[in-house]
């Protein structure tokens, strides 16, 4: 917010991040860091799926589903208000950090299609390099992440018209496609991966200390 051209400072001041509920509930210290950013809290489908696949009772699962719907309905209203105020939404389409050996963490979440319908334009930003890596002994505990030296490169796509992008993807699908919304998100992830792979060719990769 203090460096760069005036337009960049203005853009930075308008960014509202989408934060999964885990960042608010997992740990008081993680929550304290999260609260340093302007954000809208959502209940990611990946989190709900983990509850549905667990051993909790059906009553608890239904209660969690109701909680998720309530949180996400409020989140969509909040994002619509952000749009009307001229703010920019920052969202990680996979809903989590990629975990090597777990390809499902690299797949975009189906609900990202809702963002494509809600907003007018988007920029896809890929992030090469990682200074904060999973601890292989405890990949679910963010407080045990490993701080590492690395070269980070951020790369942004051209501005993309959301409606045109979405319609183009849908127009190429068969009429009986079982999940067209997921296909639009898959295309987003395809572009991000290609962008990432291209930058990786010129990046100096650093290993752990």
What are these regions (language model features)?
Residues 13-16, 38-39, 72-75, 85-89, ...:
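Generic beta-strand structural signal
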Residues 65-81:
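A Trp-anchored, charged/polar loop motif used as the substrate-binding/catalytic surface
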């Amino acid at each position: 917010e203090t460096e760069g051209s005036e337009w960049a400072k203005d853009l930075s001041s308008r960014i509202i991040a989408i934060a999964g509920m885990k960042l608010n509930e997992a740990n008081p210290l993680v929550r304290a860091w999260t609260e340093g950013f302007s954000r809208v809290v959502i209940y990611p489908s990946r989190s709900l799926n983990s509850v549905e696949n667990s051993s909790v009772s059906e009553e608890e699962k239904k209660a969690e589903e109701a909680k998720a719907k309530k949180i996400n309905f409020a989140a969509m209203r909040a994002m619509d208000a952000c749009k009307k105020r001229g703010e920019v939404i920052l969202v990680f389409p996979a809903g989590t950090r990629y975990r090597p050996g777990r390809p499902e963490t690299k797949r975009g979440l189906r609900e990202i299609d809702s963002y494509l319908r809600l907003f007018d334009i988007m920029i896809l930003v890929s992030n090469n390099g990682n200074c904060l890596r999973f601890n292989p002994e405890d990949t679910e505990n963010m407080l045990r992440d490993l701080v590492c030296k690395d070269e980070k490169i951020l790369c942004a796509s051209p501005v993309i018209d959301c409606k045109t992008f979405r319609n183009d993807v849908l127009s190429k699908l068969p009429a009986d496609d079982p999940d067209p919304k997921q296909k639009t998100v898959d295309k987003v992830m395809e572009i991000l991966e290609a962008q990432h792979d291209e930058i990786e060719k010129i990046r100096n990769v650093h290993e752990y200390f």
